[in-house]
UniProtKB/Swiss-Prot annotation:
Signal peptide interval: none
Tissue: Strong expression in narrowly defined pattern restricted to the lower and middle cortical regions of the hair shaft in both developing and cycling hair. During hair follicle regression (catagen), expression levels decrease until expression is no longer detectable in follicles at resting stage (telogen).
Gene: Krtap19-1
Organism: Mus musculus (Mouse)
21 X 2 AA repeats of G-[YCGS]: annotated segments: 6-72
One GO CC term, this protein: cytosol
UniProt keyword terms in alphabetical order: Keratin, Repeat
Superkingdom assignment: Eukaryota
Homology family: Belongs to the KRTAP type 19 family.
Oligomeric form and interacting partners: Interacts with hair keratins.
The protein's role, per its UniProt record: In the hair cortex, hair keratin intermediate filaments are embedded in an interfilamentous matrix, consisting of hair keratin-associated proteins (KRTAP), which are essential for the formation of a rigid and resistant hair shaft through their extensive disulfide bond cross-linking with abundant cysteine residues of hair keratins. The matrix proteins include the high-sulfur and high-glycine-tyrosine keratins.
The protein's name in its UniProt record: Keratin-associated protein 19-1
Record's note on what induces expression: Expression in skin and hair follicle is regulated by HOXC13 and by GATA3.
Length: 87
């Protein structure tokens, strides 16, 4: 499953990471899980984005702060699900 879009600091989209990391939508390099990092869209966008699992102020499945499910950044909400661990 090659769910990633290799953009370095750009806009990740679909199943894809913003920072060109592997897996289904990384937040930054080597971060796996669903939900791209910054300004992405589709499955897991980053800052103020939309879709599954946005990071900051987004909506959908699992935002970073107080979010849940797929596409969190912080291990407090991500580690338990095994999605998109920040560390």
């Amino acid at each position: 499953m090659s769910y990633y879009s290799g953009y370095s600091g750009g806009l990740g989209y679909g199943y894809g990471s913003s920072f060109g990391g592997p897996g289904c939508g990384c937040n930054s390099i080597r971060r796996l899980g669903c939900g791209s990092g910054y300004g992405g869209f589709g499955y897991g966008s980053g800052y103020g984005g939309y879709g599954y699992g946005s990071d900051y102020g987004g909506y959908g499945y699992g935002s970073s702060y107080g979010g849940y499910g797929c596409g969190c950044r912080r291990p407090s909400c991500c580690g338990r699900y095994g999605f998109s661990n920040f560390y």
